[in-house]
Amino acid sequence: MKTYFQKPQEVQRKWYIIDARDKIVGKVAEKVACLLRGKHKEVFSPHVDTGDHVIVINASKAIFSGKKETQKLYSAYSGYIGGQKTFSPVQIRQKRPNFIIEHAVRGMIPHNRLGRKIYTKLHVYEGSDHPHAAQKPIPVTLD
């Protein structure tokens, strides 16, 4: 019996929606990364993009476990001397509430060309409104 690899044009992509309200950031990101990569499908292979589109709503209301809300730091470097800045999750939430979920998911998918393509199927929204109602997204609960 030959091994079957699904071609990218044969993939049936679905849309999923996850509500991040009062959910732990890492658990949301883990589920999102799994759906984006397509690891929940029987035809998954690591070198083919078999994943689905994922919508995350209420990203600004996701929580951290433990003391990460006060102790965790995100860093950014401008490339100039003295250009390294650190931000706490509280500061990030004020400026870009979607960044926390996006950053966590980005760390859980491959860091290569395929990962960049997979990442384009992630849609994160601060509130509960999103423009993808026409796609009829399937609600996903975190177990």
From Swiss-Prot:
Q: What is the lineage of its organism?
A: Bacteria, Pseudomonadati, Verrucomicrobiota, Methylacidiphilae, Methylacidiphilales
Q: What's this protein's name?
A: Large ribosomal subunit protein uL13
Q: Pfam families annotated for this entry?
A: Ribosomal_L13
User: Does the record carry Ribonucleoprotein as a key word?
Assistant: yes
What is the protein's known function?
This protein is one of the early assembly proteins of the 50S ribosomal subunit, although it is not seen to bind rRNA by itself. It is important during the early stages of 50S assembly.
Keyword list (alphabetical) reads:
Ribonucleoprotein, Ribosomal protein
Molecular function via GO: mRNA binding; structural constituent of ribosome
Similarity comment: family membership: Belongs to the universal ribosomal protein uL13 family.
Q: Identify the GO cellular component terms for this protein.
A: cytosolic large ribosomal subunit
Q: Share what the entry says about its subunit structure, partners included.
A: Part of the 50S ribosomal subunit.
| Source organism of this protein record | Methylacidiphilum infernorum (isolate V4)
Tell me the disulfide pairings in this chain: none
Domain of life from the UniProt record: Bacteria
The biological processes this protein is annotated with in GO are: negative regulation of translation; translation
